[in-house]
Amino acid sequence: MNLKTHAFNDRGRIPSRYTCDGENISPPLSWDGVPGEAKSLALICDDPDAPSKVWTHWVIFNIPPDSTGLEENVPDAGRLPDGSVQGYNDSGTLGYRGPCPPSGVHRYFFRLYALDTVLDLEPGASKEDVLEAMEGHVLGEAKLIGLYRRG
């Protein structure tokens, strides 16, 4: 599987538009190579360089397996029209919250998972809930890393 965005290169700088210094909207993402037997997709974005813990910026799951991406500025709703479900980020809100590092360059990992099941979770599920429900059901994975430093 492959995960990419036209907004920045893998390991490139995330434009401020997608951060707390800009519009704080989700970047457009696209993918291909999803296994044919996939029943759903899940996407998690987090920052392993946060000072106190890995900081979760986005949790979205039960994405239809035949989808090829997410448009820019996914609404902050629990359930989306295509059936996708969003969980809480570590800011305590549904949907995407962009990079806002306190200091230095941080890495933001966008991970896409192809699953052999649809997750039986409600809107507002945590990253930990999603990872636990995914256990033993991952058919494939793709990763995209963006970098951001304030100022």
Swiss-Prot record:
Q: Which InterPro entries does the entry mention?
A: PEBP, PEBP-like_sf, YbhB_YbcL/LppC-like
Superkingdom of the source species: Archaea
Alphabetized Pfam families for the sequence: PBP
Family classification: Belongs to the UPF0098 family.
NCBIfam families to which the protein is assigned, alphabetical: YbhB/YbcL family Raf kinase inhibitor-like protein
List, alphabetically, the PANTHER family matched.
PEBP (PHOSPHATIDYLETHANOLAMINE-BINDING PROTEIN) FAMILY PROTEIN (PTHR30289:SF1), UNCHARACTERIZED PROTEIN YBCL-RELATED (PTHR30289)
Q: What is this protein called?
A: UPF0098 protein MTH_273
